[in-house]
């Protein structure tokens, strides 16, 4: 195949889930598979991560897709619901809701459903995105416990804003706030991937790993391999053209890169239309025949151009890897001034995923 494909390593997924268990042995695992399993394929990933204790998604459509694929474990809808139709659909699929504002609570009190739902309550401990202010959490819990649409209030959760930052002053404050919220009898959940790795006292009853399941590090200067994770996605393609250029020849849109000498370049079938970052700069590493070569010129919609001076025997059809076990997605993200989350999630639908 001369076009891009994403190879998904099932054994690496299972390994990374086990790594979470090793780091948080006393916690249950809510595997975060939102955004199409971080670009790896929602149901494909869930089928491999069946040993997780629950799944977490952001959208109702993701949750129903898991149910339709046959998954019967708890599926937690992190964003909750916003109207009667969504609530009824959530009830029909036996989902677990996150309730993070009073409009959702009002809806649960107003609408009658035949199958009451378990809920988590979300508190805003400092990220100021979703969640009840700490001082009203007890009131929200009390109302939910009296609500006919609520089967049970399972637990209290919050989200860490900067656990992945090297100079993180906020996480201890958030944890102190979280622990100060009165929620007797409720399970607790706070830890994302970064906190699973470096804040064991944030593990509580449930951890919510996302990025680390897919083998990447949430830390700006780290790699998943450095903490015992295995890369799950290999984004690969092939060379589709070889050119022998002269000194002064320019490459790509805008003629932004000029050949310093007579040299060979290769064109690979991969571009921003496939999810490769358009802002990857010249010098971004790409593997040709397993060896690194630099990207040169701008990324096009369907193609990238590579400096083959260190690969004089490269030919049309040779394999090209944009990221994978031997070229961390974190490194590519740094060259594109972005984060691995974005690179994995933005691999487009025209790139076929193959589980191996």
Curated annotation (Swiss-Prot):
Q: E.C. number, please? A: 5.1.1.1
Q: Which Pfam families match?
A: Ala_racemase_C, Ala_racemase_N
For this record, the Gene Ontology CC terms, alphabetical, are:
cytosol
User: Which top class of enzyme applies to this chain?
Assistant: isomerase
Q: Which GO terms fall under molecular function for this chain's record?
A: alanine racemase activity; pyridoxal phosphate binding
Q: Name one GO biological process term.
A: D-alanine biosynthetic process
Cited SMART domains: Ala_racemase_C
Indicate the family of this protein: Belongs to the alanine racemase family.
Q: What is this protein called?
A: Alanine racemase
Q: What is the lineage of its organism?
A: Bacteria, Pseudomonadati, Pseudomonadota, Gammaproteobacteria, Chromatiales
């Amino acid at each position: 195949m001369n076009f891009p494909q994403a190879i998904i390593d099932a054994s690496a997924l299972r390994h990374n889930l086990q790594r979470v268990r090793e780091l948080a042995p006393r916690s249950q695992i809510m595997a975060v598979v939102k955004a199409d399993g971080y670009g790896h394929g929602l149901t494909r990933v869930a089928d491999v991560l069946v040993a997780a204790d629950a799944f977490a998604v952001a959208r109702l459509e993701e949750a129903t897709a898991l149910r339709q694929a046959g998954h019967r474990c708890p599926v937690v809808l992190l964003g909750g619901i916003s109207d009667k139709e969504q609530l009824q659909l959530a009830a029909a699929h036996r989902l677990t809701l996150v309730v993070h504002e009073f409009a959702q609570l009002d809806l649960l009190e107003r609408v009658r459903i035949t199958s009451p739902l378990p809920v988590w309550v979300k508190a805003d401990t400092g990220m100021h995105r979703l969640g009840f202010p700490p001082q009203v959490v007890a009131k929200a819990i009390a109302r939910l416990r009296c609500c006919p649409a609520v089967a049970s209030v399972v637990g209290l959760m919050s989200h860490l804003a900067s656990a992945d930052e090297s100079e993180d002053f906020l996480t201890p404050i958030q944890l102190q706030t979280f622990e100060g919220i009165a929620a007797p009898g409720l399970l607790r959940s706070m830890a994302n991937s970064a906190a699973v790795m470096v804040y064991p006292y944030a593990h509580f009853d449930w951890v919510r790993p996302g990025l680390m399941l897919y083998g990447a590090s949430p830390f700006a200067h780290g790699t998943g391999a450095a903490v015992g994770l295995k890369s799950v996605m290999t984004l690969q393609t092939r060379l589709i053209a070889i050119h022998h250029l002269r000194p002064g020849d320019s490459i790509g849109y805008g003629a932004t890169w000029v050949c310093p000498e007579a040299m060979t370049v290769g064109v690979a079938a991969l571009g921003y239309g496939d999810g490769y970052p358009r802002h990857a700069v010249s010098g971004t590493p790409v593997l040709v025949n397993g060896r690194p070569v630099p990207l040169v010129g701008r990324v096009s919609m369907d193609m990238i151009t590579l400096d083959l001076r260190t690969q004089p025997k490269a030919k049309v059809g040779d394999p090209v890897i944009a990221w994978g076990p031997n070229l961390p997605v974190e490194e590519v993200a740094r060259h594109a001034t972005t984060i691995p989350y974005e690179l994995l999630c933005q691999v487009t639908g025209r790139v076929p995923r193959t589980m191996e």
